[in-house]
Amino acid sequence: MGKCSGRCTLVAFCCLQLVAALQRQIFDFLGYQWAPILANFLHIMAVILGIFGTVQYRSRYLILYAAWLVLWVGWNAFIICFYLEVGQLSQDRDFIMTFNTSLHRSWWMENGPGCLVTPVLNSRLALEDHHVISVTGCLLDYPYIEALSSALQIFLALFGFVFACYVSKVFLEEEDSFDFIGGFDSYGYQAPQKTSHLQLQPLYTSG
């Protein structure tokens, strides 16, 4: 029962991670955020690997999944620092999230709750084929939305890491005990015996 509860809990957290990652991937696609798109794709693959390892009792897959979660926590911590401009990080310095391929920002910048977008006509700040907009009235600015989204990812990743370590430890202990007691012999397994189709004939000797 304990093993099942641990596995079921890990699968549930993996499913939550998958839903949160897909939701985030959609909004990053809408905002042309290529660096987060790549990271989200790798994260989705790792979560699927974690689900497969949990269902199929593969401890190695869970170890890889747990190792990825460490990197995932670090990435999301960087995103929080980036959008909140912690230290030397600044959103106006460069466009890290788009690999410097476009001037797009987060999709939430223009589509946040309560945001009112007003085009600025004849602005000298506008580059070629671009326009300047003014965003006002937002109930929550987009840097805080992105930071909250990353904080949610960190929360799920920490719980997933703990349960992945626990379940993989259970799997490894079961594998060790299985090898120690002789594999299939403990379950009454017997190898099939070869049957002979030769018929024995009586041997007569003359006295």
From Swiss-Prot:
It is found in: Cell membrane. It is a multi-pass membrane protein. GO terms for cellular component: plasma membrane. The keyword Transmembrane applies. The chain crosses the membrane at residues 2-22, 35-55, 62-82, 147-167. One of its GO terms (molecular function) is ATPase binding. Detected in the brain only and specifically in neurons. Expressed in multiple regions such as cerebral cortex, thalamus, hippocampus, olfactory bulb and brainstem as well as in cerebellum with high expression in granular cell layer. InterPro entries: Na/K-Atpase_Interacting. It comes from the Eukaryota. Pfam families: NKAIN. The keyword Glycoprotein applies. Keywords: Cell membrane, Glycoprotein, Membrane, Transmembrane, Transmembrane helix. Glycans are attached at N100. Interacts with ATP1B1 C-terminus. Belongs to the NKAIN family. This is Sodium/potassium-transporting ATPase subunit beta-1-interacting protein 1. It comes from Mus musculus (Mouse).
